[in-house]
Structure formats: structure tokens, C-alpha cells
Amino acid sequence: MAHKKAGGSSRNGRDSDGRRLGVKRFGGQDVIPGNIIVRQRGTKWHPGTNVGMGKDHTLFALVEGKVTFQTKANDRTYVSVLPLAAEAAE
């Protein structure tokens, strides 16, 4: 009896490439307007002050400043950008 695996097994063995999602600028990092902060599917992170959201839920900076992440009482994580003027005042 010949010992050969079924010919159909060659139909397996493919996978799609990763989508490169996740945080692109972490807390404390400097950003300029238009910088992508987070790429995501759905709203794992929500836009806070000075952060916009694209149609694919990408979060991006609206002003120049520092990125901050904060979790609020509703268990949502908000991403904000503290403007440079506010940083200088602190």
C-alpha cells in the first residue's frame, strides 16, 4: 500500500498579511497636525480633545502637541493631544 498523503492537502497553507493596526504614537510623544496616532477596527480608543477620527476609525492629531491616553469612568480610553501652548504654561 502506497503511503501518500491525500493530494487535496495542498489546498491548505495560505494566510492573509497582517493589517498593521495599533498605536502609532504613544503617550508623551510629540505629534504635528495630521499625524496618525492609532489605527484600529472599531473604536477601541476614542477621540478626545484635539484628536479627529477618520471613516475607518483612525485617530489623528488636529494640533501640534503631546499625546495623552486617559481612561474615564465609562471604561473608555480617550486619546487627546495637549497643545504646545498648554505644555508651556504647565
Swiss-Prot record:
Example GO BP = translation
Which segments carry the region annotation Disordered?
A: 1-27
Keyword Ribosomal protein listed: yes
Q: Which UniProt keywords apply?
A: Ribonucleoprotein, Ribosomal protein
Q: Which InterPro entries match?
A: Ribosomal_bL27 (IPR001684), Ribosomal_bL27_CS (IPR018261)
Q: Which GO terms describe its cellular component?
A: cytosolic large ribosomal subunit
Protein name, per record: Large ribosomal subunit protein bL27
Q: Show the coiled coil region(s).
A: none
What SUPFAM superfamilies does this protein map onto? Answer: Ribosomal L27 protein-like
What family classification does the UniProt entry report for this protein?
Belongs to the bacterial ribosomal protein bL27 family.
One Gene Ontology term of the molecular function aspect:
structural constituent of ribosome
